A protein has these predicted regions:
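Short histidine/acidic/glycine/proline-rich micro-motifs that form metal-
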Residues: 30-37, 165-169
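A structural signal for isolated positions on well-ordered beta-strands in alpha/beta enzyme cores
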Residues: 25-29, 57, 135
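ATP/NTP-dependent adenylation/nucleotidyl-transfer catalytic domains that generate, transfer
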Residues: 121-124, 128-210
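Active-site adenylate/phosphate-handling loop in enzymes that bind or generate adenylated species
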Residues: 75-147, 193
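Short, surface-exposed alpha-helical segments at coil->helix boundaries
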Residues: 11, 39-46, 145, 149
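Single conserved hydrophobic/aromatic residue that forms the stacking wall/gate
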Residues: 1-6, 10
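A conserved beta-strand->alpha-helix junction
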Residues: 43-68
């Protein structure tokens, strides 16, 4: 429900680029997935972005849910949304794409990869996509989801008109509950999980079995 509000937080922070060096320019892009029955207030988003002096671009796309029944709707939507973002970025000469993922997103992805993929990895704060000559950055990677929710409430950001019907049916929503359970066991669990990503003790891990 707060995806749009994350975008607005990024735009608000981007406004501060006027006092930073090196100089850079930003544009806001909203990808509309026409085959998923959710609804955003596009006029509100456009007015908010342009009120900060940020150009707003709306790009529609869709995908066929039947193309790969092994993949969840959330995975297919995310993959096609990302592809559309690359298309728009290339068309407008952008070299970086700033995504609104926060710390909770990154830790939930880590837990999903461990649980379902048997891999220790997640979404990095910075990812150079050499194939596309593009860099993905996640400027809110250290921000808690609860802090963004508080900011959205204080600033009076509007929520989506209609949320995605698949929102509560994904592995991510399950991992969100797992993270909450871990924090009940240890209030500092999120920081331990984060620290584990840069504290790999290879000598204490089993060798790969072919």
């Amino acid at each position: 429900p707060y995806r749009r509000q994350r975008q607005m937080c990024i735009r608000d922070r981007a406004k501060r680029s006027r006092i930073l060096k090196p100089r850079f320019t930003v544009m806001a892009v909203h990808i509309g997935m026409t085959n998923i029955p959710y609804q955003s207030d596009l006029e509100y988003l456009k007015n908010y972005a342009e009120g900060l002096g940020v150009p707003f671009v709306y790009f529609e796309t869709s995908f066929d849910l039947s193309t790969d029944t092994r993949k969840s709707p959330c995975f297919l939507c995310s993959w096609n949304r990302r592809k559309a973002l690359f298309t728009v970025a290339k068309e407008h000469g952008c070299t970086k794409i700033a995504l609104g993922h926060h710390m909770d997103d990154i830790l939930e992805t880590l837990l999903m990869n461990i649980t379902f993929q048997g891999a220790f990895g997640t979404m990095p704060p910075r990812l150079v996509m050499r194939k596309f000559d593009m860099t993905i950055i996640r400027p809110m990677c250290l921000v808690h989801e609860s802090d963004l929710s508080d900011m959205a409430r204080v600033r009076g950001y509007r929520r989506q008109i209609k949320n995605c019907p698949y929102e509560s049916q994904s592995n991510r929503s399950d991992m969100k509950e797992v993270l909450k359970s871990l924090e009940k066991l240890n209030p500092e669990a999120r920081y331990s999980l984060w620290g584990s990503m840069t504290n790999i003790q290879e000598d204490l891990l089993p060798d790969k079995i072919d």
